[in-house]
Amino acid sequence: MKTPETLAFECETGNYHTFCPISCVAWLYQKIEDSFFLVVGTKTCGYFLQNALGVMIFAEPRYAMAELEEGDISAQLNDQKELEKICLQIRDDRNPSVIIWIGTCTTEIIKMDLEGIAPKLEKQIGIPIIVARANGLDYAFTQGEDTVLAAMAHRCPEYKHCTTNLKNRTDEMARIDNHTTNKSPFEASKLTRFNLVLFGSLSSSIASQLNLELKRQSISVSGWLPSQKYEELPGLGEGIYVCGVNPFLSRTATTLMRRRKCKLVGAPFPIGPDGTRAWIEKICSVFDIKSYGLENRESEIWENVKDYIQVINGKSVFFMGDNLLEISLARFLIRCGMIVYEVGIPYMDRRYQAAELLFLQHTCRKMKTPLPRIVEKPDNYGQIQRMHELKPHLAITGMAHANPLEARNIDTKWSVEFTFAQIHGFSSVRDILELVTRPLRRRGVITPGFRSLSKQTTGD
């Protein structure tokens, strides 16, 4: 098989494996600390959440299942009354600041009017209700977060209200009876002339590090979507610049631009030292600020991880496609000296990822490496045949194919691990390389000197 010399896109419209997007509850309920997620679905959805999240219901996590029964599907029960009972119980037991309903495949099939029921119920219970249809009709499981953030963007306060009256909350909160707050989501001291809002769910430590990196360039971040507290959602509107940190948030980006009239900063994503530097430089250029110190910072980090890079330099990797992080990870691994044969990706918004695709081409030219083949909606059967021919050193794949590929003597890494690991910013580079090199270390395909430096040498 010939490796293409130019950026080639293909769409196989085949069968591929990924998780259900309702899995976004796993990380979003921890990020939004005063929220409660209610998944409206069947027993299958409940079994998936129970197994995927690994939290026993006795631990009383801030999410729950509203299990559909035969009476719901046959329209013998009143959907509004049934959901009202559950939401009242949630209010009395947990008293969250917001309840987020997650629609599923079944609610789509039976045409359950969640958007029509939510406004009526939130007036009754005095708590805002956000409806997000994060169902299995999406292309990849990470798009669940995209759906939730796009729905949450509509509830962010209007930017002009934040500047004129700091005591006003969001418009939707004003419509809810008997539900007030003493804290403004947007304080005057936090407003800057740049008005930059970042969107994407990251751990608090990584978000703080990205804030600090921008602060070093004299740029203060106005807020994050999502915020840790629902009442702290950033103000949106004309004059606000928004920038994403994850490549699977195209729906949120579209909502912010078209519905909230924000200006999108099209930048590569801050994954790897090269991506983080390019991300910061792009934001600086939008605000006419000359960045400084980034080149030296990036060089120092590459020097600090050269032991890891020696392990994967010259090795080949094949992305089967699972979580929409594939383009950014491929670009980073090419910069580390790896050869990427193919990048399978369930779905790609070429407009939202335009800067990342250009950066991928730039990286390939810099490393004098042929551009990888990009396959949307890949056919897993065809990919396995191509891997049999190419014999890559490593396959980054979904869990469904890991063991079969290992049996074919191909080292694998679960792509879902990159979703939950800290991979953003300058400080997370070692964590990414730790994940990538672990399968090679497990087989002993490393030098003895490196083994003593690694944090983990056996098992996944």
From Swiss-Prot:
What is the free-text note on the cofactor?
Binds 1 [4Fe-4S] cluster per heterodimer. The cluster is bound at the heterodimer interface by residues from both subunits.
> In which residues is [4Fe-4S] cluster bound?
C20, C45, C105
According to the UniProt entry, what is the EC number of this protein? 1.3.7.7
Q: In its keyword annotation, does this UniProt entry include Metal-binding?
A: yes
Domain of life assignment: Eukaryota
InterPro entries linked: LIPOR_BchN/ChlN (IPR050293), Nase/OxRdtase_comp1 (IPR000510), Protochl_reductN (IPR005970)
Which reaction(s) does the protein catalyse, per the Swiss-Prot or TrEMBL entry? chlorophyllide a + oxidized 2[4Fe-4S]-[ferredoxin] + 2 ADP + 2 phosphate = protochlorophyllide a + reduced 2[4Fe-4S]-[ferredoxin] + 2 ATP + 2 H2O
Q: What is its main location?
A: plastid
According to UniProt, this protein's pathway is: Porphyrin-containing compound metabolism; chlorophyll biosynthesis (light-independent)
An example GO BP is: photosynthesis, dark reaction
Q: Which UniProt keywords apply?
A: 4Fe-4S, ATP-binding, Chlorophyll biosynthesis, Chloroplast, Iron, Iron-sulfur, Metal-binding, Nucleotide-binding, Oxidoreductase, Photosynthesis, Plastid
A Pfam family for this UniProt protein? Oxidored_nitro
User: Could you name the Gene Ontology cellular component terms for this entry?
Assistant: chloroplast
Q: Which GO terms describe its molecular function?
A: 4 iron, 4 sulfur cluster binding; ATP binding; metal ion binding; oxidoreductase activity, acting on iron-sulfur proteins as donors; oxidoreductase activity, acting on the CH-CH group of donors, iron-sulfur protein as acceptor
User: What EC class is this?
Assistant: oxidoreductase
Which cofactors does the annotated protein need, by name?
Answer: [4Fe-4S] cluster
Q: Where in or outside the cell is it found? A: Plastid, Chloroplast
State the function annotated in the UniProt record: Component of the dark-operative protochlorophyllide reductase (DPOR) that uses Mg-ATP and reduced ferredoxin to reduce ring D of protochlorophyllide (Pchlide) to form chlorophyllide a (Chlide). This reaction is light-independent. The NB-protein (ChlN-ChlB) is the catalytic component of the complex.
Which NCBIfam families does the UniProt entry name for this protein?
DPOR_bchN (TIGR01279), PRK02842.1 (NF002768)
On assembly, the entry states: Protochlorophyllide reductase is composed of three subunits; ChlL, ChlN and ChlB. Forms a heterotetramer of two ChlB and two ChlN subunits.
Could you say which protein family the record assigns here? Belongs to the BchN/ChlN family.
The protein's name: Light-independent protochlorophyllide reductase subunit N
Organism in which the protein naturally occurs: Adiantum capillus-veneris (Maidenhair fern)
